A protein has these predicted regions:
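Compositionally biased, low-hydrophobicity segments enriched in charged and small polar residues
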Residues: 1-2, 50, 200-207
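Membrane-cytosol interface segments of multi-pass membrane proteins
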Residues: 1-150, 154-158, 169-175, 186, ...
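Short intrinsically disordered, low-complexity segments
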Residues: 11, 216-219
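Alpha-helical transmembrane segments and their membrane-interface exit regions
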Residues: 115-118, 157-165, 202-207
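Active-site rim beta-loop-alpha module in soluble metabolic enzymes
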Residues: 180-184
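Short alpha-helical packing/oligomerization segments
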Residues: 192-198
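Conserved small/polar residues in nucleotide/adenosyl-binding loops
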Residues: 208-217
């Protein structure tokens, strides 16, 4: 994982530390208050945890751009997804067998992140026709649907990667897909937690004021 210090704001490692800290707090609260607890302390911690996903999306895009070996990078992400599956499911009492306990949140977000990288590679392929790329995108959406953040994480990575070089457009796509996930939560799972998901947009504020300039990342 390679990073250079930036002229202003946070460097890559500092942003990653924020993401890891927020994720740890979020997951710890899920274990202390299982289910969709409306305890104010739990809600506050879950709001803090919303910082994690968009930072992950951003660094998947940056990692893809700067990696020296995209095949090894892809392999590392899928290994992470495999390890995270057992850790995530053990922590939350979910069956290790996919889809046995339902279709929502059946594995960690790492599964969707890894497939998001695959979509970036597919999108940049010069050999694949557009219709086949579209078919693959829909197939990846189906494959990643049961994971934490569902297929939204993979598709958000694709759109943010397509807008690389235009930070404002990247943040717009981030907010659009975050709002989509929030709407699903609001309609099908829990209204309060649907609103909580909207706090993902806090990451936009963080990036606007603290984002790293001229930072290289090889995740």
């Amino acid at each position: 994982m390679e990073s250079t210090l930036t002229r202003r704001g946070l460097n890559g490692n500092q942003l990653k530390l924020i993401a890891i800290t927020a994720m740890t707090i979020d997951h710890l609260v899920w274990t202390l208050w299982p289910g969709y607890s409306h305890n104010p302390a739990a809600i506050a911690c879950h709001i803090m945890g919303r910082l994690t996903a968009p930072i992950m999306w951003f660094f998947i895009v940056e990692g893809y751009h700067y990696t020296h070996d995209v095949n090894k990078y892809t392999l590392r992400l899928f290994i992470l997804a495999l390890v995270s599956h057992f850790a995530y499911n053990f922590c939350f009492g979910i069956s290790f067998v996919p889809l046995k306990d339902g279709v929502f949140n059946q594995t960690s977000v790492a599964w969707s992140l890894a497939w998001g990288l695959v979509l970036l590679r597919i999108n940049d392929s010069k050999r694949l026709p557009h219709w086949l790329k579209a078919v693959i995108v829909f197939a990846v959406c189906a494959i990643t649907f049961p994971s934490d953040w569902s297929c939204v994480a993979a598709v958000a990575i694709l759109f943010m990667g397509s807008a690389r070089g235009n930070f404002k457009q990247q943040m717009i796509w981030m907010m659009i897909w975050s709002a989509t996930y929030a709407a699903v939560y609001f309609i099908f799972l829990d209204k309060i937690y649907g609103i909580i998901q909207l706090f993902t947009c806090l990451t936009t504020v963080s990036y606007t004021h603290l984002r790293a300039h001229e930072t290289r990342h090889d995740l």
